[in-house]
Amino acid sequence: MMAVAAATRIAVVVVAALAALAPGARGLRRDDFPVGFLFGAATSAYQVGWSIMGCSHGGWVWSLPFLVDPGRISDRRNGDVADDHYHRYTEDVEILHNLGVNSYRFSISWARILPSRFGGVNSAGIAFYNRLIDALLQKGIQPFVTLNHFDIPQELEIRYGGWLGAGIREEFGYYSDVCFKAFGDRVRFWTTFNEPNLITKFQFMLGAYPPNRCSPPFGSCNSGDSRREPYTAAHNILLSHAAAVHNYKTNYQAKQGGSIGIVVAMKWYEPLTNSTEDVRAARRALAFEVDWYGFACYLPFL
């Protein structure tokens, strides 16, 4: 039902937008949208300021490369402060309110909640997200919470090789359960992973994102295997997603009344020619980039 509702609302937006472009159109108004339509904004944890505050140990996989080699960014900046959301979240919530949005999608920093392995829940991290969620709700803004947006604790990268190691699946299960318990009484919309297809592509095939793993001809990295590792990472991510969804639906959904899903970055491929080879290549690319994650099962022709 969620997929159908989302598709319907997207269709409404597209139709309304096209109508607004027609000659003599008066433009879009809020009352052109159905009651209950959610207008929103979105961020991710690292992009708005990781901040050492609220983290008692370690760090995450995105912070280390810029500490070890700050020159990889031309002006030597990193995301440790960014717009300092950790300290200025009340201002950000007020800005959202003034914009008139009624939903806000943000990601939780895994490293802020569980900076070390099992059992080490960071109370300061829990407290920060409680404050943020409560501030949003007080302004009539529905929180949409993403559990993982490209980042993992650095310790798990060292211990398991990040998403390349099967052990990280249990770690994600524990982390997601902590979040359901801590925030689920107020959060109605959960996302396990943001764009897992981009995680595998840019972290393990092209090596553009930390941990920067790749191999020729896809890129020139210090380590990695672009022909194998994206599949291994995707396998572990999808099993982690499935376990978290099962746990939520089994143990939390009836009481908390929320829903849970995954966000996939959509794109489309067209064959260069009508040849069988090109048609199959386009189909494989679409299956690898989208279908595999949307259907959450391995497609044999990959």
UniProtKB/Swiss-Prot annotation:
UniProt key word Signal: yes
Gene3D superfamilies reported in the protein's UniProt record: Glycosidases
InterPro entries for this protein: Glyco_hydro_1, Glycoside_hydrolase_SF
UniProt-listed Enzyme Commission number(s): 3.2.1.21
Binding site for a beta-D-glucoside: 47, 149, 194-195
Disulphides: 214-221
Enzyme class: hydrolase
Protein name: Putative beta-glucosidase 17
Organism: Oryza sativa subsp. japonica (Rice)
Lineage, highest ranks first: Eukaryota, Viridiplantae, Streptophyta, Embryophyta, Tracheophyta
Gene that this polypeptide is encoded by: BGLU17
